[in-house]
């Protein structure tokens, strides 16, 4: 009887430990999520019109719903991380932790087609060269959010002289 109680107690402790540890095992960091959703170093979509359909599924962006828009960056992770060392700009959400690349980068823009309907998500694949903007956080400071891509780099708005007062 004592052995049976010991085994049951051990199993209970094991189950409690697994329940305690399990949520932290399944939690994807923001940096890891950025890499999964946006990084495809050393690859290109130019010869594959089904690139977005394949990658969106492979990278788990069609589970439960079709993600409407996503961008993959075809540069090294180090080159994308280096964007975080540029001068900061304001993100689309108003936060000041966005940074724009100094040069254009090879990207693939994936956009849901009009015929796309979950679970049969369908995407249009467009290969482009654009300046990318990423939000960065953490220590080390790394990309955690893809904020956009533009053809021309952001330019600072020149300051205007103070208005003249009429006397």
From Swiss-Prot:
Disulfide bonds: 52-110, 66-121, 84-136, 91-98
Coiled coil: none
Residues bearing carbohydrate: 88, 155, 159
Name of the molecule in the record: Brain ribonuclease
Signal peptide (from-to): 1-26
Residues that, per the record, bind substrate: 33, 36, 67-71, 92, 111
SMART domains for this protein: RNAse_Pc
GO cellular component, one term: extracellular region
Location relative to the cell: Secreted
Species: Bos taurus (Bovine)
């Amino acid at each position: 009887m004592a052995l049976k109680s010991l085994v049951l107690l051990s199993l209970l402790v094991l189950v409690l430990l697994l329940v305690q540890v399990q949520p932290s095992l399944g939690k994807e960091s923001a940096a890891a999520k950025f890499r999964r959703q946006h990084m495809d170093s050393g690859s290109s979509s130019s010869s594959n019109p089904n690139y977005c359909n394949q990658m969106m599924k492979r990278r788990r962006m069609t589970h439960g719903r079709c993600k409407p828009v996503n961008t993959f960056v075809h540069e090294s992770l180090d080159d994308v991380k280096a964007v975080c060392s540029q001068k900061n700009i304001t993100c689309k959400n108003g936060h000041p932790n966005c940074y724009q690349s100094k040069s254009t980068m090879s990207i693939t823009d994936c956009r849901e087609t009009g015929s796309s309907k979950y679970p049969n998500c369908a995407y249009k694949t467009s290969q482009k060269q654009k300046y990318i903007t990423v939000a960065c956080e953490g220590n080390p400071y790394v990309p955690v959010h893809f904020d956009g891509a533009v053809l021309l780099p952001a330019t600072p708005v020149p300051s205007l002289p103070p208005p003249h007062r009429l006397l």
